[in-house]
Amino acid sequence: MSERQSAGATNGKDKTSGDNDGQKKVQEEFDIDMDAPETERAAVAIQSQFRKFQKKKAGSQS
């Protein structure tokens, strides 16, 4: 789980993000083995959380 925290994700409060507006953003390429068991487990977990979110969102709008 520590890999997730150190992945460089920000919460929108980063003051230096505006400094790079003039620079071209380079997209990182990831080589992810889509057949790996841990990748499948991660995908299922993400989908499950997304479905819960959608269900909660739909329930609050009614």
From Swiss-Prot:
Residues 12-28 have a biased composition (Basic and acidic residues). The keyword NAD does not apply. Residues 39-62 form the IQ domain. Signal peptide: none annotated. Keywords: Calcium, Calmodulin-binding. It comes from the Eukaryota. Residues 28-40 are annotated as: Acidic. One of its GO terms (molecular function) is calmodulin binding. Restricted to the nervous system. Expressed throughout the brain, in particular forebrain regions, including the granular layer of the olfactory bulb, and pyriform cortex. Also expressed in the hippocampus, caudate putamen and the cerebellum, where it is associated predominantly with Purkinje cells. Belongs to the PCP4 family. Mostly intrinsically disordered, with residual structure localized to the IQ domain which mediates the interaction with calmodulin. Binds to both calcium-free and calcium-bound calmodulin. The affinity for the calcium-bound form is 50-fold greater. This is Calmodulin regulator protein PCP4. It comes from Rattus norvegicus.
